[in-house]
Structures are given as C-alpha cells and as structure tokens.
C-alpha cells in the first residue's frame, strides 16, 4: 500500500510512515495511490543522508545559540536581581545604623538632662541645709542666756543640737520627680510603699544614690532611715 499526502504530495510506504509524517508535519490529508515510490540510487541516498545530517547539525547549532542566549538573559536577570537585593540590604542596614545613632544621641541627651536635674537638686539640698544650720545657730544664739557663777567656782556649759525628726527624699523615676517626707524612725520599706502609692508603680526593691554612688537593698529595708547615711535628705533612684 502506498499513501500520498495531499498537502505536500509525498509518497509514504505504509500507514506507520503516514502517521510519522503527520506527527512531524501536522499534515492529516492522505489517500491511497497507484504511484510507486521511486527507489533511490546509492548516490541519492548518500545525498539525502548528508542533507539530513546538515539539517540536524543546523538544528543543533540553533538550539545551542538559543540556549546560550537564554543563559545570558537569565544571568542578566539574576545579576540585576542580586544588585537590587544588595542595594535593598545596604539601604536597610544604613537605616538601622541611623536609628541606632539617633537612639544613642537621644539617650545621651536624656542622661545629660537627668544629671543636670540631679546636680540642681543636690545644690538646692546644700543651700537648704546651709539655711537650716544658719537658722538653728541664730536660734541658739538668741535663746542662750549667760550664767553667772561665783568666783573661783568651776563652770561649764554645753550646747546640744537636736537631731532631725524627719527625712526628706526626692524620688526620680522615668522623668518623674516625687518628694516624700517620712519620720526618722520609719524604714526604707515604708518609703518604698509610699513611692508605689504616689508614683503608681510596684514597690521598689532597691534605692540608689548618684552622688555619692551608693545602693540600699532589701537587707537594710527594715532599718530606720535615721540609721542610714542617706539621712536626713537625699536624691534616690528606685529600682526593681
């Protein structure tokens, strides 16, 4: 049986060859024919094989060039993506460093302001204490009366200073200032309770002073404040 492709007039020796031809060319119009398939001479077969080889070679070269172009295109896309990613990473890192720098500057400014306030409070305390001493000395001089003693008699006079009956403490926390006065016999634990009530926080478990640097923990919380070296007044920073 010989089949003829009505679309390209090619003669095919079997149904299988027609199916193969249809797969390669998408031709689907065939009919039986009485024409005979002309047998090729050895030279024609050789030329046909050589032509097929050339076509296969050309096809392979085209595929290689297309693959190379595709590879170049993919590389450019990847390189561009990597450059954009690296640029985005650098931008994010720069922004993070800028935020850290701003935080450091803000913290330094807050520390300087806090130190300024503490120094000012210490200076006010010094002036207040000096004024209290001056007032007490003036009162003693005004109320002291001379005592006459007989001749040749031993005489002595003493002047005692009345210790403070209360302590005045300036509490500094989170930008807030709270002044609290408690009796000399009251304890740091009672002071901590007042800090919690007035500043709306939990009772602190430790107090520190900046000038001079000292800390007072729970081991001294039950001692009267007049037995501690922060009495009669101090600037305290609560801690938890």
Curated annotation (Swiss-Prot):
Keyword tags: Metal-binding, Zinc, Zinc-finger
- InterPro entries reported for this sequence: Ubiquitin-like_domsf
Annotated C2H2-type zinc fingers sit at 3-27
Q: Does the keyword Zinc-finger apply?
A: yes
What CDD domains does the database record attribute to this sequence?
Answer: UBX
List GO terms (cellular component aspect).
cytoplasm; cytosol; nucleus
What biological-process terms (Gene Ontology) are attached? negative regulation of proteasomal ubiquitin-dependent protein catabolic process; negative regulation of protein K48-linked deubiquitination; negative regulation of protein ubiquitination
* Basic and acidic residues composition-biased segments: 120-136
Q: Which domain of life is it from?
A: Eukaryota
Recorded GO molecular functions are: K48-linked polyubiquitin modification-dependent protein binding; zinc ion binding
Q: Does the keyword Hydrolase apply?
A: no
Which named protein is this?
Uncharacterized protein C17C9.11c
